[in-house]
Amino acid sequence: MRRRDLLDLLLLAAVWGGSFLFMRIAVPEFGPGPLMELRVGLAALTLLPLAILRGKVPLIARRWKAILVVGALNSAIPFLLYAYAAQSLGAGFMSVANAVTPVWGAVIGWLWLKDRLPLIRTIGLSISVLGIVVLVWDKLDFGTGGDGPAVLAAISAPLFYGIAANWTKRFLSDLDALSSATGSMIGASLILAPLAISTWPATPVSWQAWSATIALAILCTGFAYIMFFRLIASVGPTGAVSVTFLVPVFGVLWGVLFLDEIVTTQIMAGAAVILVGTALTLGLVRWPLSSGSKPRSV
């Protein structure tokens, strides 16, 4: 990996890690629906000029049905779940929970598209699930004022990312990333609009919340997508997906620096176990095999 690619990877991880920080700042004033509508709407406006310049709009229009599904699964639903969780959970916790996204992608691919899931990746999946258990062990309180619903929202959001990735692979594999991203943001904006309108804040929103929202939409969504596309073109999908391992680092760091969050031993242990499992699931780490042995598939 070239130095420029490494810098891009670090910058992208820092930006995506910051999305959890900005959600924590903005969601108390906007609420989940309006905040996520602004996120996808402003992101769409950021990407749309580039799509127009590259002549992608006719292609988006022809494939609008499949792209709309991506908008729901990859943006509207998971973004809304994270925004709901951000009302009570820390940025660091959510960024660690997000690290299981590639794991769900592998599982859904195995169940739906019959992709091979070698034994080593099955072990990685099991380890990641164990990491989630460690992470949420003492937070599943469903009593009044408990964090249980928020925790379920945070750990469910990556599942929809995994479904979206496989939907894209199944129905939109021939569509370029810019068209898919732009179209899905427009679709997500249309999906979230009714909820946003019906729950729009009745009181004025502070400039701090507006600033966090604009950063979340333009920097952490629109700009981040463009950076991610560039990384894929430069280092390939496997290299680009390694950003998964860096996002929790920055998510935790920003939470500590700007929100005075406390990094508990439980969060660190959960993060370590999840990241080891994710690395195995992605095939980025080779399990020591005896000479001449071959990994089995399930």
Where are the regions that the model predicts?
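Helix-helix packing/entry segments at the starts of transmembrane helices
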Residues: M36-L38, S75, F79, F93-V100, ...
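Transmembrane alpha-helices of multi-pass small-molecule transport proteins
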Residues: E29-I77, W104, F160-A164, A181-T199, ...
